[in-house]
Amino acid sequence: YCLGKAFRDAEAGRRHNPEFTMLEWYRCDWDEHQLMGEVGELISQLYAAANALGLGRESPPLAIHKTSYTDCFEQVMGVNPHVAPLSDLQQLAVACSSDSWANESRANCLDLLFSQQVEPQLPKGLVLVYDYPACQSALAQVAINGDGHNVSRRFEAFLNGMELANGYFELRDPTEQQRRFDQDLKHRVEASRPAMPVDNKLLAALEQGLPSCAGVALGVDRLLMQLQGVDSITEVMPFSWERC
């Protein structure tokens, strides 16, 4: 595991700070569902401890919900994210954004719709969303779900509507990872976005062999926000972006 500082340029706001604290850990011979259970247990225990100490707002015991990406997306948007035509997703994206989405990829459209439309409708408590669309796999393996759709073997954890953690059943195939890097670079060029350098160290590590494992990254500052019942990330940091 690793507990330490992470940095992300060009993001500052109520839930974002360029410097933040991340807890990341891996479990060998586990899949994403086993790790998802451990994430739920960790957050539940911390939530109960915060309540017992009287931290933050008074709140009831933590409710835990598990749902597939398909179910929560269809419930809010009325379309299946795996089979809806890209043109339909682009039109839905335009409806909730002032920008043009005519040339955006399927992954970007789904990301916008989920963050702007679906996340605000998630139930209170801890929500664990799994089986994301295959186009959003990043570093995760892909499998076929019960409906015959390719899905990403990853999950995200949301506490009271705020994203806290992102986990993967880790991809181990260097050729497939190279293909994904190339595809992402192509989409960035087509969208006139800055090109990102390929992570050759990761590819070299995959060439050497990675054991079967699942990994997750959890935002500690956001978790503290929820445990203490505060509305801004600056309230749980000694030196936020504005005070540096």
Enumerate the predicted regions with their spans.
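A common structural junction motif
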Residues: 43-50
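A translation/RNA-centric and nucleic-acid-associated enzymatic feature enriched
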Residues: 1-42, 70, 74-244
